[in-house]
Amino acid sequence: MDAEHRSHHPALKPIDDRELARESWKIFQIMGEFVDGFEKLAHLRPSVSIFGSARIPPGDPLYQLTEEIALKLSNAGFAVVSGGGPGLMEAANKGAFAGKSPSVGLNIQLPHEQHSNPYQDVSLYFRHFFSRKVMFVKYASAYVVMPGGFGTLDELAEIITLVQTGKTRKIPIILVHTPFWQGLLDWFSHTLVKHGTITPDDLDLFVILDDVDAIVKHIFQYYERAITGPSAEERANFMEI
């Protein structure tokens, strides 16, 4: 196809001024979300980000387990950060809210499903998933990943990728509830490793733990063993987030 013909293709028509203005306004919205997040979260360290399903109701054993984990972390001195919505996000905030450290909700505006839970000391609101995910990562000392759907899997894949590629520092990534995660781990081992798309060492980037006390102990032991921080070369490769 010659250049003249391509220039008239409907998919390549120039952007009009109104659409350009809308896109420019979105950039300012995103900048505002980053600034608000940085200002509100910078002093809330150490913190643990907890991910999990919005669809698991109170009374479910996983809800109760998430609440217990968050309470234990809060009483151990960690601010607890969740997505701010219902389900296991609510359980995380509820447990932390009853503890000694701040409960933080990173709320996302969705056309359905998401509503803010009432157990938040600090609440932030986002239109954009990617700026919200930066806030989950930037100040976290550990990640706890409860059972969840596509959103939880997206968050898990992103944090593993950031650590694997050296774009953020290595910190504990803890998957909770072996019966839920075992199939995924088997697929990692038997399919991804087998085909060479990940290495066996990549499986060491995370652990599975089911006991509440073991989760808190693992985080503390990780930092007790981490005598030195990242090298200058590693720091140079980290994302500026």
Can you describe what each PLM-predicted range is?
Residues 175-241:
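C-terminal functional extensions of proteins
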Residues 36-40, 78, 97-101, 111, ...:
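Generic secondary-structure signature for well-ordered alpha-helical cores
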Residues 109-115, 152, 180-183:
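Short gly/pro/ser/thr-enriched loop/turn and capping motifs at secondary-structure boundaries
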Residues 2-7, 13-106:
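Glycine-rich beta-alpha loop segments
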Residues 87-145:
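Acidic/glycine-enriched connector segments
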Residues 46-49, 78-79, 101-105, 121-124, ...:
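Structural motif
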Residues 41-43, 72-74, 96-97, 114-118, ...:
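Solvent-exposed alpha-helices and their adjacent loops that cap or buttress functional pockets
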Residues 127-179, 223-228:
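Active-site/ligand-binding-proximal alpha/beta "capping" segment
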